[in-house]
Swiss-Prot record:
<feature type="transmembrane region" description="Helical">
    <location>
        <begin position="23"/>
        <end position="43"/>
    </location>
</feature>
<keyword id="KW-1133">Transmembrane helix</keyword>
<dbReference type="Pfam" id="PF03741">
    <property type="entry name" value="TerC"/>
</dbReference>
<dbReference type="InterPro" id="IPR022493">
    <property type="entry name" value="CHP03716_TM_YkoY"/>
</dbReference>
<feature type="transmembrane region" description="Helical">
    <location>
        <begin position="199"/>
        <end position="219"/>
    </location>
</feature>
<protein>
    <recommendedName>
        <fullName>Uncharacterized membrane protein YceF</fullName>
    </recommendedName>
</protein>
<dbReference type="InterPro" id="IPR005496">
    <property type="entry name" value="Integral_membrane_TerC"/>
</dbReference>
<dbReference type="GO" id="GO:0005886">
    <property type="term" value="C:plasma membrane"/>
</dbReference>
<feature type="transmembrane region" description="Helical">
    <location>
        <begin position="158"/>
        <end position="178"/>
    </location>
</feature>
<feature type="transmembrane region" description="Helical">
    <location>
        <begin position="79"/>
        <end position="99"/>
    </location>
</feature>
<keyword id="KW-0472">Membrane</keyword>
<feature type="transmembrane region" description="Helical">
    <location>
        <begin position="221"/>
        <end position="241"/>
    </location>
</feature>
<comment type="similarity">
    <text>Belongs to the TerC family.</text>
</comment>
<feature type="transmembrane region" description="Helical">
    <location>
        <begin position="131"/>
        <end position="151"/>
    </location>
</feature>
<keyword id="KW-0812">Transmembrane</keyword>
<keyword id="KW-1003">Cell membrane</keyword>
Length: 257
């Protein structure tokens, strides 16, 4: 009963308007919230990349809808997980499932291959697509990944503060940032096709990182960010080389005509 009472008290504090008044007028509170938003933003770069790839197969308008609908689910998961607090540490299996799903996307892209009309990780003959349709099946997949990402984000947030109001405001702003970054990645992938392969390489690294954290091995954030920056730098160089090659081929073809 004490355990249940503790959880209910935590959720009840979300609606303590006096507390919110004190929080929103306290500069120290905003300092903590700002720190958490920055942390969430840095951690959300890889999450946003995964979400961008997951919705890439949809028409442009449906991509935005899928990310928007997934946004509501992400807020719900974040609200629930903040209430549960440190009990998240017991949900290691969510990270394992998320890592396995990401690993499958990488294997399918590089080794198994897929038909052009089949989505990245979302086959048209899969049971989810047959049951819910391609759009809603994609939304469900996004929600499942949000579930795994919520575990990572909340555990990281507890390192900044264990105060409910810091976790709630910082976490909600972090989710919004993740969706914004995901939309930017979608635009970049359309303009620089080589980024798609880079995305799957990084998704493989993310899968290893997520699986490792489930068994208490944490890749240093500095190492992970260096890998991301290096991957994007190499991709831009390859894109430039391919562009120059394409220009030379077009020039040669026009001369032959």
């Amino acid at each position: 009963m004490d355990f249940l009472h503790h959880i209910l008290s935590t959720y009840a504090s979300f609606f303590d308007w006096k507390m919110w008044g004190e929080v929103l007028t306290d500069p120290v509170s905003w300092g903590l919230i700002g720190s958490l938003v920055v942390l969430e933003g840095l951690l959300s770069a890889d999450n946003a990349l995964v979400l961008a790839v997951m919705v890439k197969h949809l028409p442009e308008k449906q991509r935005k809808k899928a990310l928007t609908y997934g946004l509501f689910g992400a807020y719900i998961f974040r609200f629930i997980f903040i209430g549960l607090g440190m009990l998240l540490i017991k949900f290691w299996w969510i990270k394992v499932l998320g890592a396995l799903y990401l690993a499958w996307l990488v294997i399918k892209h590089f080794w198994i291959g897929e038909k052009e009309e089949e989505a990245d990780g979302m086959k048209k003959n899969s049971w989810m697509v047959r049951t819910f349709g391609i759009f809603w099946a994609t939304v469900i997949s996004v929600e499942l990944m949000d579930l795994a990402f919520s575990v990572d984000s909340i555990l990281a947030a507890f390192a900044v503060s264990e105060k409910v109001w810091v976790l709630l405001i910082g976490g909600m702003l972090g989710i919004l940032m993740m969706r914004t970054v995901a939309k930017v990645f979608l635009v970049l992938i359309d303009k620089i096709p080589e980024l798609e392969n880079t995305a799957f390489v990084l998704i493989g690294i993310i899968a290893l990182k997520m699986a490792g954290s489930a068994f208490h091995y944490e890749m240093p954030h500095s190492v992970f960010f260096i890998i991301i920056i290096a991957a994007f730098a190499v991709t831009l160089i390859i894109h430039y080389i391919n562009k120059q090659k394409q220009v030379r081929e077009q020039t040669a073809a026009s001369k032959e005509e």
